[in-house]
């Protein structure tokens, strides 16, 4: 979020809320940072109002005025992110009994145009997964890197992980007999993720060759020095293989998660099962992937039917 005013110190209630998100809800560092920026901007705005308002003293009238100002500065999506942070903050204060009602009650953000998620076709996924082997055969990478990079992509596609969840994987997370990982995702919610036979065999092979003495608390994905592979390293690694497969550079690890969900639905998986696998709190979040599948069916019909 750019062009922010100078950030005043946040009131204790806001700092406690951010700690709650990080420590209890287990939100990602990026989400907590975005919430902090939203609260800092709102606090700065309140201090510029007559009487230098405290966040716990505002009314819905103040919030509406603030939202109008946000919409003159930011795109709709960013305005909604700010609004979401404030809504969560006041919901927390309400639960603690610090306020009697949320000033955001009845206030909705600007409507967004729904965009279908980008995803890779099954053929494109196969090209992507073949990348490490190609580089190894050309002696462009070492065997460790080739198998580790293949494992990263097999797990991303086989388990539908968020990239932060993938980076956090430890050997104790996996039941190697069943091929199921126990994941703690957004908001600290736990879910079970089957990764598939191919990813599981790749994991066993990597462990046998390069991590034989690893224990339950040791990271699955590591650097050449044995340190945990960071989210940033995973993102950069994927860009390398996208380039190798001549695929668009704007595809991210999260787009592989989109591909995972879309391919499950294309092949007949139940929508609620996919919701559980992805760890979505709401079915409506998962339903966007049905729109992708319907769009593909319509496109196939248009191209194949003589009267389409």
Language-model segment annotations:
Residues 1-308:
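Conserved catalytic core of the tyrosine transesterase superfamily
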């Amino acid at each position: 979020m750019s062009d922010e005013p100078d950030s005043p110190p946040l009131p204790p209630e806001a700092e406690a809320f951010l700690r709650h998100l990080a420590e209890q809800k287990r939100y990602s560092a990026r989400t907590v940072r975005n919430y902090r920026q939203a609260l800092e901007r709102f606090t700065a705005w309140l201090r510029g109002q007559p009487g230098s308002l405290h966040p716990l003293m505002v009314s819905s009238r103040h919030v509406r005025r603030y939202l109008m100002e946000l919409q003159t500065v930011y795109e709709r999506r960013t305005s909604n992110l700010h609004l979401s942070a404030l809504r969560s903050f006041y919901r927390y204060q309400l639960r603690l009994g610090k306020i009697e009602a949320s000033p955001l009650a009845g206030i909705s953000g600007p409507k967004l145009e729904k965009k279908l998620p980008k995803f890779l076709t099954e053929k494109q996924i196969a090209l992507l997964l073949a990348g490490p082997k190609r580089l190894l055969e050309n002696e462009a990478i070492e065997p460790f890197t080739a198998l580790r990079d293949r494992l990263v992509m097999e797990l991303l596609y086989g388990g539908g992980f968020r990239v932060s969840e993938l980076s956090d994987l430890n050997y104790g997370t996996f039941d190697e007999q069943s091929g199921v990982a126990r994941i703690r995702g957004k908001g600290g919610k736990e879910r079970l993720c089957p990764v598939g036979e191919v990813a599981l065999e790749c994991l066993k092979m990597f462990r046998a060759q390069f991590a034989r003495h690893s224990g339950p608390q040791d990271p699955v994905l590591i650097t050449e020095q044995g340190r945990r592979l960071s989210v940033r390293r995973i993102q950069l690694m994927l860009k390398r293989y996208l380039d190798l497969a001549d695929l668009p550079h704007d595809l991210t690890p999260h787009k592989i998660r989109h591909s995972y969900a879309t391919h499950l639905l294309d092949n007949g998986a139940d929508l609620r099962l996919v919701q559980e696998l992805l760890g979505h709190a709401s079915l409506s979040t998962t339903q966007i992937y049905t729109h992708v599948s319907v769009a593909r069916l319509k496109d196939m019909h248009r191209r194949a039917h003589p009267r389409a």
